[in-house]
Amino acid sequence: MNRRNFIKAASCGALLTGALPSVSHAAAENRPPIPGSLGMLYDSTLCVGCQACVTKCQDINFPERNPQGEQTWSNNDKLSPYTNNIIQVWTSGTGVNKDQEENGYAYIKKQCMHCVDPNCVSVCPVSALKKDPKTGIVHYDKDVCTGCRYCMVACPYNVPKYDYNNPFGALHKCELCNQKGVERLDKGGLPGCVEVCPAGAVIFGTREELMAEAKKRLALKPGSEYHYPRQTLKSGDTYLHTVPKYYPHLYGEKEGGGTQVLVLTGVPYENLDLPKLDDLSTGARSENIQHTLYKGMMLPLAVLAGLTVLVRRNTKNDHHDGGDDHES
């Protein structure tokens, strides 16, 4: 290729690059909650820390207990391949005043939050994690899972746990007791933890009705009395209890795009190891980045293809012309 054709090709490449639109950085958007999606409301102020929910969860999901031995408060307060649901306690100072920041303590229930737009689903390369299109429950398929554990890194709540002792490998997380082989919800039952909670600290229902109930509680006057329901809002099983001073925030309404497990507390949620997250879901953010990268890759490839065709054509013309014209 002579100098004239080289300059011509370079100029055309620059024009092609300038003519192509720049990569769009349109803001990612949250996926809307599935209408009627199922979830739980956990009211930390009602929890008595009995761990009945933990035991029931293990009875349903792990009939063979952790081989490390009997579970007690000291070794059963962390999520593991043998425990999908746990109760942790936070303390401050002397730790004698329930749901108080000063010299107080509070309980927190930990399990999969069933995010509205879950990042674990977004990052899974083989779709071993899927969000049920009707219930919104995040389900796991062990037969598809490759054990890459991307979901463990992606989860902002550090929920999925991998069983390294299983020769085939397996992930464990809460599926609201409706996974294949259990299907309590499909059979008309309740998640085990909801069924056995004596204080109604965790109740089951649609995200919409649970959110309405949570906001109703936040509007109650501290010191007044309220009929708190057990199991579900429509169970008819309620008990009269003094309204605490709630921390004025419903966790899970907007955090990370929203969750189907909602939390009310009497102390700042940061104290209970609930992460502070942006309103934009992690799933939406990661997918937007992926799509932007893929779109961005196409532009330089298109330019490169155009330049390649132009160079090949000019090279062929050079052969026909008999070589360089030696212009300076």
Curated annotation (Swiss-Prot):
Residues that hold [4Fe-4S] cluster 4 according to the record: 124, 145, 148, 151
GO process annotations (BP): anaerobic glycerol catabolic process; anaerobic respiration
Record's signal peptide: 1-27
Location of the protein in the cell: Periplasm
GO cellular component, one term: plasma membrane
Residues reported in the UniProt entry to bind [4Fe-4S] cluster 1: 47, 50, 53, 197
Molecular function per GO: 4 iron, 4 sulfur cluster binding; hydrogen:quinone oxidoreductase activity; metal ion binding
InterPro entries for the chain: 4Fe4S_Fe-S-bd (IPR017896), 4Fe4S_Fe_S_CS (IPR017900), FDH_Electron_Transfer_Unit (IPR051555), TAT_signal_bac_arc (IPR019546)
SUPFAM superfamilies per UniProt: 4Fe-4S ferredoxins (SSF54862)
PTM text: Exported by the Tat system. The position of the signal peptide cleavage has not been experimentally proven. Can also be exported by the Sec system.
Cofactor binding, note field: Binds 4 [4Fe-4S] clusters.
Disulfide-bonded cysteines: none
Binding site for [4Fe-4S] cluster 2: 57, 174, 177, 193
Residues where [4Fe-4S] cluster 3 binds: 112, 115, 120, 155
Keywords carried by this UniProt record: 4Fe-4S, Iron, Iron-sulfur, Metal-binding, Oxidoreductase, Periplasm, Repeat, Signal
Ranges for domain 4Fe-4S ferredoxin-type: 38-68, 103-134, 136-165
Required cofactor(s): [4Fe-4S] cluster
Name of a matching Pfam family: Fer4_11
NCBIfam families in UniProt: PRK10882.1 (NF008134), TAT_signal_seq (TIGR01409)
UniProt function note: Participates in the periplasmic electron-transferring activity of hydrogenase 2 during its catalytic turnover.
Name of the protein in question: Hydrogenase-2 operon protein HybA
Organism (species): Escherichia coli (strain K12)
